[in-house]
Amino acid sequence: MIDNYDDVPDDSKEKVEAIYNEIIRMLDAENNEKILSKKSVLSAKLKNLIALGSALASQQSQNVIFCVKESMKTGATQKEIMEVLRVAILMAEIPAEAYTEIVKDAVKAFEADY
């Protein structure tokens, strides 16, 4: 058993770091879902649309897909989601073509569920 990061063979450290980062990302997503579902003055739909804009601005593809799903789950329409995408493209200067495709694919994937 490896007790310490220094004990990891050099040729495996990149894999270990990738696994660690993925675990942290997953934990953050679960925590974010709990935060977004708490009652507040903002509706769950609005909080999820804001989270989508933030995920787009930070160019985190997996979070974008998750936020599209959560937005749709709380009643966001395709038009509302695309409006968030337009604002993110303008404000954060994200790659429009790539993220438009990601968002459209996510909407298409989840539209039957919501």
Q: Where are each of the predicted segments found?
A:
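Acidic, glycine/proline-rich low-complexity segments that act as flexible tails and inter-domain linkers
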Residues: 1-46, 99-114
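Residues at alpha-helix boundaries and short interhelical turns
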Residues: 40, 57-61, 75, 93-96
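Short, surface-exposed loop and linker segments with low hydrophobicity and enrichment for Pro/Ser/Thr
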Residues: 45-48, 80
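Amphipathic, charged-and-aliphatic alpha-helical interface segments
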Residues: 47-61
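Mid-chain, well-packed structural core segment of small domains
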Residues: 58-85
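C-terminal structural segments of small proteins and small subunits
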Residues: 82-107
